[in-house]
């Protein structure tokens, strides 16, 4: 009986400590999330000089990034495997 009471009390203390630690982390979470969203948003504003996988392209022009080639059939950049 004493052992079960001790385990129950230890479990409650552990639950309290974990809850307090997660609550303090949650206070910082919204700030971190907003900073990451705005950092990604700033990155999207930059344009690349070449087109990546799945971007539409014009065959014959060198618009795709290195290791990609413009498919004359589908008219989008695909991985260039060579021949």
Swiss-Prot record:
A Pfam family of this chain: Toxin_12
GO CC list: extracellular region; host cell presynaptic membrane
Subcellular location: Secreted
GO molecular function: ion channel inhibitor activity; sodium channel regulator activity; toxin activity
Highest taxon above the source species: Eukaryota
Primary localisation category: secreted
Record propeptide residues: 22-48
Family matches, as InterPro entries: Huwentoxin-1, Huwentoxin_CS1
Cystine crosslinks: 50-65, 57-70, 64-77
Tissues showing expression: Expressed by the venom gland.
Keyword line: Amidation, Disulfide bond, Ion channel impairing toxin, Knottin, Neurotoxin, Presynaptic neurotoxin, Secreted, Signal, Toxin, Voltage-gated sodium channel impairing toxin
List of residues that carry Leucine amide: 81
Keyword Ion transport recorded: no
Signal peptide: 1-21
Subunit and partners: Monomer.
Miscellaneous comment as given in the Swiss-Prot or TrEMBL entry: Negative results: has no activity on Nav1.4, Nav1.5, Nav1.8 and Nav1.9 sodium and calcium currents.
Domain notes: The presence of a 'disulfide through disulfide knot' structurally defines this protein as a knottin.
Reported function: Selective antagonist of neuronal tetrodotoxin (TTX)-sensitive voltage-gated sodium channels (IC(50)=1270 nM on Nav1.1/SCN1A, 270 nM on Nav1.2/SCN2A, 491 nM on Nav1.3/SCN3A and 232 nM on Nav1.7/SCN9A). This toxin suppress Nav1.7 current amplitude without significantly altering the activation, inactivation, and repriming kinetics. Short extreme depolarizations partially activate the toxin-bound channel, indicating voltage-dependent inhibition of this toxin. This toxin increases the deactivation of the Nav1.7 current after extreme depolarizations.
Family membership noted in the UniProt record: Belongs to the neurotoxin 10 (Hwtx-1) family. 15 (Hntx-3) subfamily.
Protein's UniProt name: Hainantoxin-III 7
The organism's taxonomic lineage, starting at the top: Eukaryota, Metazoa, Ecdysozoa, Arthropoda, Chelicerata
